[in-house]
Each structure stands twice: as C-alpha cells, then as structure tokens.
C-alpha cells in the first residue's frame, strides 16, 4: 500500500490506553484508537491527554489509526 492511499486527519487525544495506545476524537466527532508511529517512538516524543495530533488512517479500517505528528 502506498502512502497516497492513507487518510490524514487531525484530532485531540481524549484518553491514554495501555501499550502506547490512545483514544483520539477526530474533528468530525468520531473516536478512534491510535498508536504512535515508529519514528515518534524512536525520538521519545511524549503524548499527553489534550494534545492535538495528526492521525493517519487506512481506508480499509476506519476505527484504527497511527499518530504521526503532535502539534504544539
């Protein structure tokens, strides 16, 4: 799957779950479970409840996503 097929949305972290999973509320009101991308894990970027994040989602499963950027 190429990078162009992924859907990129913004949202807010509303809950921290075990195993570096987060519940994110998207701007359109939907809630999804998301995990941290490997690059964010490598650079020890911390994500807290209330942070604005960019989430990448695949069109095949719209209930899961990958956090790729934490906005300041």
Swiss-Prot record:
It is found in: Cytoplasm. GO terms for molecular function: ribosome binding; rRNA binding; translation initiation factor activity. GO terms for cellular component: cytosol. PANTHER family: TRANSLATION INITIATION FACTOR IF-1, CHLOROPLASTIC (PTHR33370:SF1). InterPro entries: NA-bd_OB-fold, RNA-binding_domain_S1_IF1, S1_domain, TIF_IF1. Component of the 30S ribosomal translation pre-initiation complex which assembles on the 30S ribosome in the order IF-2 and IF-3, IF-1 and N-formylmethionyl-tRNA(fMet); mRNA recruitment can occur at any time during PIC assembly. Belongs to the IF-1 family. HAMAP family: IF_1 (MF_00075). One of the essential components for the initiation of protein synthesis. Stabilizes the binding of IF-2 and IF-3 on the 30S subunit to which N-formylmethionyl-tRNA(fMet) subsequently binds. Helps modulate mRNA selection, yielding the 30S pre-initiation complex (PIC). Upon addition of the 50S ribosomal subunit IF-1, IF-2 and IF-3 are released leaving the mature 70S translation initiation complex. It comes from Dichelobacter nodosus (strain VCS1703A). Keywords: Cytoplasm, Initiation factor, Protein biosynthesis, RNA-binding, rRNA-binding. The gene is infA. It holds the Pfam family eIF-1a. This is Translation initiation factor IF-1.
């Amino acid at each position: 799957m190429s990078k162009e097929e992924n859907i990129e949305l913004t949202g807010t972290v509303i809950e921290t779950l075990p195993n570096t999973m987060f519940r994110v509320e998207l701007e359109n009101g939907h809630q999804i479970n998301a995990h941290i991308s490997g690059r964010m894990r490598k650079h020890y970027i911390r994500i807290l409840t209330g942070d604005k994040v960019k989430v990448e989602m695949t069109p095949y499963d719209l209930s899961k996503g990958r956090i790729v950027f934490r906005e300041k």
